[in-house]
UniProtKB/Swiss-Prot annotation:
It comes from Dictyostelium discoideum (Social amoeba). Keywords: Aminotransferase, Mitochondrion, Transferase, Transit peptide. It is found in: Mitochondrion. This is Aminomethyltransferase, mitochondrial. The glycine cleavage system catalyzes the degradation of glycine. The gene is gcvT.
């Protein structure tokens, strides 16, 4: 039941992120997915695996207990070059990049003049450049946005030194789960990865393949995202998958978009186009922690004045919250109701049954007075009000690496 629910969510809930074109792009691992029996679907203009024969539930649980491999090569990889790269990028994202040490990564968001979120992004200080990863569904939009902002930046001062490089010859493989570190270490002979901090990046030679590895992920588990030359991507994936087989429950097994979605929802992580969009600000999205004290005070990013006002007490009209529902899972768009008046106070943006807790969990936006943890609300499911409780997120404990 959970597997089918997740697949339906991915395929139906936000159709602008799906392509019906016959000219779907394919990652370097496309044929490998098919050899592994994956169910392929169009996603963000790419042909991607939504699940493998084991099913979404088993893939999800294997990542929580062991390790799973995700092909995330559809995401955009960029480098921002030039001596003014930090000044420039701080003019389009909310992150404090001046304070980001070399080799460290940070989640941030691009904002528009209304303070709305254009996309969320991972930014790494790579020393001589900024390494940036953007969402597949927003990649073309983000690239155009960055190019346009570079032109504006240089028009103010022609001596400004900044440029963007698209890393189109690289694939991106994520391996996630509690046993991932020990498995990866077997393929890395020249360095100790047990002392690698969460949200840091290193060059790494994996089984003789030169890669760039970031300790991060989108599941709530420890894990790594590996930027690898596309010509070597299949070999690397096959090496990881060879640590497991159908007869054993350890090692790295393949996981698709379905498990990726249920894992990130349990972990309380946003999906752009569902839980975030260009009308929602970081403050409404409960992402205040993305904005450092310096950036809150100085601003300097699009929509800063609006965001600064929302940071004040009672300045934010709505908040992203977790919701635990006493019944069937709520789908995107289900209304949140005030039990005392039956008036609409918000909407669900993501929902499923948690494979770990077996509860019906959702993310939603509600009017700020109803956002306190423990608040009782109703959720309208198929026209019927179902009792629910505003919950903290994540819905399950995260297991990020701690030194």
């Amino acid at each position: 039941m959970i597997s089918q629910n997740i697949i339906k969510i991915i395929q139906k809930s936000n159709k602008r992120y799906f392509s019906s074109s016959n000219e779907l792009k394919k990652t370097a691992l496309n044929e490998l997915h098919k050899e592994l029996g994956a169910k392929m679907v169009p996603f963000c203009g790419w042909e991607m695996p939504v699940q493998y024969p084991a099913g979404v539930m088993k893939e999800h649980l294997h990542v929580r207990k062991e390790s799973g491999l995700f092909d995330v090569s559809h995401m955009g990889q960029l480098r921002i070059h030039g001596k003014d790269r930090v000044k420039f990028f701080e003019s389009i994202v909310v992150a404090d990049l001046q304070a980001l040490p070399t080799g460290h990564s940070k989640l941030s968001v691009f904002t528009n003049e209304k303070g709305g979120i254009i996309d969320d992004t991972m930014i790494t200080n790579a020393g001589d450049s900024l390494y940036v990863v953007v969402n597949a569904g927003c990649a073309d939009k983000d690239i155009s946005h960055i190019n346009e902002k570079i032109k504006e930046f240089k028009s103010v001062n022609p001596t400004h030194d900044v440029s963007m490089q698209l890393l189109e010859d690289l694939s991106l493989i994520a391996i996630q789960g509690p046993t991932t570190e020990s498995i990866l270490q077997k393929f890395v002979k020249d360095q100790d990865i047990t002392n690698m901090e969460f949200m840091t990046q290193r060059p790494m030679t994996i089984a003789g393949i030169d890669c760039i590895v970031t300790r991060c992920g989108y599941t709530g588990e420890d894990g790594f995202e590996i930027s690898v030359p596309s010509k070597q991507a299949v070999r690397l994936a096959e090496l990881f998958l060879a640590t497991s087989n159908a007869s054993i429950e350890s090692g790295i097994k393949p996981a698709g978009l379905g498990a990726r979605d249920s894992l990130r929802l349990e972990a309380g992580l946003c999906l752009y186009g569902h839980d975030l969009n260009d009308d929602i600000t970081p403050i409404e999205a409960s992402l205040n922690w993305l904005i450092s004290k310096r950036r809150r005070e100085e601003g300097g990013f699009p929509g800063a004045s609006i965001i600064q006002k929302q940071l004040q007490k009672d300045g934010c009209p709505q908040k992203r919250v977790g919701v635990i529902i006493n019944g069937a899972p709520a789908r995107e768009g289900c209304l949140i109701l005030d039990p005392s008046t039956n008036q609409e106070i918000g909407k669900v943006t993501s929902g499923t049954i948690s494979p770990i807790t077996r509860q019906s969990i959702s993310m939603a936006y509600v009017k700020t007075p109803f956002s306190k943890i423990g608040t009782q609300v109703n959720v309208s499911i198929r026209g019927k009000p179902i009792t629910a409780t505003i919950s903290k997120m994540p819905f399950v404990p995260t297991n990020y690496k701690k030194l």
